[in-house]
Amino acid sequence: RAEHRILLRQDNADQRLTKIGHSLGLVTEGRHTRFQQKMEKCLALEQWVESTSIKPEQINPLLESMGKSPIKQSVKATAIIGRPEISLEMLIDAANDRERLDAIGATQPEIMHTIETQFKYAGYIEKEFEMVEELKKQEELIIPESIHYNKIKSL
């Protein structure tokens, strides 16, 4: 079992390993090019989510049809995508931006899944990164050779 499962997911393996594999000669140029194109599309969709504001008239019909509270003023898309019942696809349709995002390939299922997961689990992922950084600091801590372990009562 992996200690940091939220970071070591199957759906982000290519993001974690393709660059390393390419530098070791294990990933072909074609595969690396496809990966870079995917990352460009992911970046475009990520920027769309971060820069888009959703107006009440765009999202409220959907929220009300689900029995959820409507919004009263424009809200950043990042806040809406955080709701468990709202998918990125629903958000794009509500914002009426599908055609523009389709044109750049940002609505491919794999791209959508990657970015939706990134935003829905952002808080958990950030906490996990913080834990990893804390563990790295602890690993660098040097225990003095003169320490008397038998005098430590909690061991």
Where are these regions (language model features)?
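Extended, charge-enriched "interface" segments that sit outside catalytic cores
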Residues: 1-3, 7-155
